Amino acid sequence: MWVLGIDTSCDDTGVGLVRDGKVVVNLVASQVRLHEAFGGVVPELASREHLKALPLLVERALAEAGLRPKDLDLVAATRGPGLIGALLVGYTFAKGMAFALDRPFYAVHHLEGHIAAAWPEGLPPPFLALVASGGHTHLYEVLDLGRYRLLGATRDDAAGEAFDKVARLLGLGFPGGPEVERLAEEAEEAIPFPVPLRGQEGYDFSFSGLKTKALHLVEKGLPKAALAKGFQEAAIAHLAEVVLKAAKDTGHRVLLVAGGVAANRALQERFKEAGLEVHFPPRGLSQDNGAMIALAAWRRHQRGFPPSPLSLGATAYWPLEEA
């Protein structure tokens, strides 16, 4: 069974092909250079770039797999959450393909896609899933496919957003995560940062205080590499402490870490040392992509979830618990 997945939820145009649960093609057209001059994503520009890139990317994906459109069995796309203009480009394109080919269409939640990318075939729920990216920092208890309980979320900035903002303060490129990580590796010592929300009763996250601390340190002219290292260490410690508290309280010993921040090597090492069974997405599936959307749709189809009606619209706001 061949599944085409499309993701245009933000600034990456993602097209993926999955065959019987295995990723065969995963193509991403990045808009980094376009948005770098603005220090962040400009929604209207993102939508226009998706319009230009998507048809060519779908054509290329099919060619790489040696397929014709009629060889597809399912078509899927991200319905939300995300930038509504960007979402509509991929979502309407996918619905149009499904209609023209008379194939089932699956409207996929963006965060379920990220979880699917890190979820090894055969791993039974329940378990914990941390989704940390430029737009989201959420901790879920995964009870089953399509059944999620939100344990905690960021109160302000997302983890990846904080990395981007600190990178901008340091005069680094966009996206900021890889740039901050690279600079932090150059430092022998870290400037200490306070770890947010220590002692809280729940499982929420907060990164705005770390961003403010970084601003004050930059204004003092302190070494940038040591600053980057201190910020990264505090951000990772915060993520780890909240997740480990949730693991202790719920009794879960299995954790998925998904989203763009999951590619951070220091974060991966921290979680591997935590004594949990930890799973990360394969290389290339941490960032937004279409293959994870195809994976999520394939699993839903295999479990007997009905296709989505073509009348269902895209949405910028969509809690995963309602997916």
Swiss-Prot record:
Q: Where does Fe cation bind?
A: 110, 114, 288
Give the GO terms filed under biological process for this record: tRNA threonylcarbamoyladenosine modification
The protein here is known as tRNA N6-adenosine threonylcarbamoyltransferase
Q: Which gene encodes it?
A: tsaD
Task: List localization entries.
Answer: Cytoplasm
* Catalysed reaction equations from the record: L-threonylcarbamoyladenylate + adenosine(37) in tRNA = N(6)-L-threonylcarbamoyladenosine(37) in tRNA + AMP + H(+)
Provenance organism: Thermus thermophilus (strain ATCC BAA-163 / DSM 7039 / HB27)
List, alphabetically, the PROSITE patterns matched: GLYCOPROTEASE
Keyword annotations for this protein, in alphabetical order, are: Acyltransferase, Cytoplasm, Iron, Metal-binding, Transferase, tRNA processing
